[in-house]
């Protein structure tokens, strides 16, 4: 199969598209044109590759997790170490690319939303690097949960706006960031943090994150002489997963597994499992699976991990699900916390809570596979930002 999506209108099957007010249509089309031009511009690509190597620190290692593999008792588990990027997560792969695009369009200001704060930090970082003015919108709840990242963004020169509307989380931060963009569209570029939003954002973010899968594919071939049997990544909006999945999409022997946040359980109201529990709707400029009530009102997503509690999911993930190309699963808060501790103790790596969801499912999956098989898990970020939150939760049981 040769996979080609999106179509010229930005649709992935019935998902995606461009549902934006007239005031943004010009900006979105301008972005589309600049992005298409940049793909065939050798100077742009050279500069992008320079910053990915010299500033971000790519390529990231593909690490054989020997002890974790022994614990699972099945397939070999390789970790794609996106936690080793500058700023500690995969987010910067995308913000570097979009900042260069903004500069090419002559825009000196950037705006972004953030949940866990990782995308905010990555945006503030590239804004400092390229001397741009930066405004970050963050839900008030997330500001409390991730106060360290707020301070980091301010250190980097960004203005952080705490959003008090709605559920005061990521969804509301996106709403406010989009409003801000509408009002300042002439000199401001919106750096979308995931494979979400109106076309061409899902495609742009996918392409900048695809460096994950391109490297992992090459590295696994070098180490094992074959492609992995499975690849696994956590899914909130879904950019680290799409970055890993997309370069493998035509390799049908490779199973692709996305892992959503089940929060307190799918049977409760407290989860962020959009693919499992969502229905098609329009959110933030695109048609996607959305958590909604019977009246079409957007529900609040819930997860211990601030980076996964988004009530929608990138349109291409829903398309993969419909095609049967990827399978989507969910992992509860408790299971993620258990996997967090497991990776700390088996490999000496403190993972982000987001990535811990992928680790949890990967260990289960590996145990059902044969020792001669192998998998790649995207370790999308490091867990420094989560240690404080987990300290409160685990105090007293850590040495039990």
From Swiss-Prot:
PROSITE patterns linked: TRP_SYNTHASE_BETA
Residues where N6-(pyridoxal phosphate)lysine is found: 91
Annotated EC: 4.2.1.20
A Pfam family per the record: PALP
Cofactor(s) it depends on: pyridoxal 5'-phosphate
Record carries keyword Lyase: yes
Catalysis: reaction(s): (1S,2R)-1-C-(indol-3-yl)glycerol 3-phosphate + L-serine = D-glyceraldehyde 3-phosphate + L-tryptophan + H2O
One GO CC annotation: cytoplasm
Family: Belongs to the TrpB family.
Function description: The beta subunit is responsible for the synthesis of L-tryptophan from indole and L-serine.
HAMAP family with a match to the protein in the record: Trp_synth_beta
Protein name from the UniProt record: Tryptophan synthase beta chain
The organism's taxonomic lineage, starting at the top: Bacteria, Bacillati, Bacillota, Bacilli, Bacillales
